[in-house]
Swiss-Prot record:
Key word rRNA-binding present: no
UniProt-recorded name of the protein: Malate dehydrogenase
Catalytic activity: (S)-malate + NAD(+) = oxaloacetate + NADH + H(+)
GO molecular function, one term: L-malate dehydrogenase (NAD+) activity
GO biological process: malate metabolic process; tricarboxylic acid cycle
Role: Catalyzes the reversible oxidation of malate to oxaloacetate.
Subunit structure, interactors included: Homodimer.
Annotated residues for binding of NAD(+): G7, A8, A9, G10, G11, I12, G13, D34, N94, I117, T118, N119, M227
Amino acid sequence: MKVAVLGAAGGIGQALALLLKNQLPSGSELSLYDIAPVTPGVAVDLSHIPTAVKIKGFSGEDATPALEGADVVLISAGVARRPGMDRSDLFNVNAGIVKNLVQQIAKTCPKACVGIITNPVNTTVAIAAEVLKKAGVYDKNKLFGVTTLDIIRSNTFVAELKGKLPTEVEVPVIGGHSGVTILPLLSQIPGVSFTEQEAAELTKRIQNAGTEVVEAKAGGGSATLSMGQAAARFGLSLVRALQGEKGVVECAYVEGDGQYARFFSQPLLLGKNGVEERKSIGTLSAFEQHSLDAMLDTLKKDIQLGEDFINK
């Protein structure tokens, strides 16, 4: 099993690479790519950790050597948020980066499962899909927007509020991956209930958690460590499913049947070919249903922006 991390010299990429070096199954290969010349050195640094995961780093304009034979590609390349920016302000820079990297994936490892971490995810996933489609290699069961950070944040905040162990809580999060498009299904957590005010306040905190980190870092960056953890969780789940483990379920932002929007985050059963089944989002509370209806225009506009970036 070979996993490639693109953007591996950045804050998320280095944290992700460290976690994967420690947690990938024995015998796996990990390849790190970034435009920054430090990248082969990051790989050497990590290679001193005594786990049975082979690691190699590549830098420069060409990601091809890192991508050859990859089963899973995780893309965290791009610029980070600064105070006063929202995820869509990143669009102008990050759209071009994702387009370029996905073009290289289409040529070098078209059958790989691809997880997009680069924000704004609502839009960058649409860009990736259109690039793969143009190259004639798009498989909607193998392209994912990684929204796992919304899930782990929800688990943490719910556990804090309700005095539970964070490991005991698993909150499904649907929709998209920015602002109002993030919708935690708080009504679906077994054995936990919320007043309407609690649900509204908690939902808002989960939606704004990225901004909370950006402001707390006082201009020094955005959520890199928790995002690295989230991306590792998703990547490792994908690897386990690709290796034949049954019953692996994660929420991610994928192209589905278009019931809500062309791309939509929902619980997915993962398997040997990526998405095995898009699971139902179940019954929503009145608050959740209202939030879902209210966000769809925003989500659809984000998606359109990505489609237009490639097709116009």
